[in-house]
Amino acid sequence: MRRTSRTKPLRPLIILTLLLLCGSLQAAPKCEDFLGTLGAYPKGIQYQGCHQDIEGQTAPLIATYKVRGAEAAVAEAHLQQTYGMGRLQFFCCMWDSLRHFHRDPHSGINYQVLMASEETLANQRSQWAQIEFFYITVSVDTLEP
């Protein structure tokens, strides 16, 4: 008398379910130099560090950078060409790109990219060298909103 397993007909279904679950998993992002992780960036951009805003609604990981005003146009062009960030505009008392979202096609991680100047009266692009620093933040949400 031959015994047949009851689970044998279910085996393909179980394997398919496990494959689908594993395929949808992605490694949790960690705090790091996000621009460096995504590729090379201009030397004028200086990585300052990364921290997590645990008080924020989505507990984002935030990598910060700074770039001298004299080199800001190169940094802006790189962020526009590489990540689709908008052109910096002067509002009131600072230059701001407004937040832009970039999805890395390799990891599937969504990044928020923002570039802004310190407070300034220099309202013409030709005056950017007078601005000591522009700041770049690249953030990744760790929780759903």
Could you describe each region identified by the protein language model?
Residues 2, 26-60, 66-145:
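An acidic-aromatic pocket/loop used at catalytic or ligand-binding sites
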Residues 13-16, 39:
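Residues embedded in well-ordered secondary-structure elements
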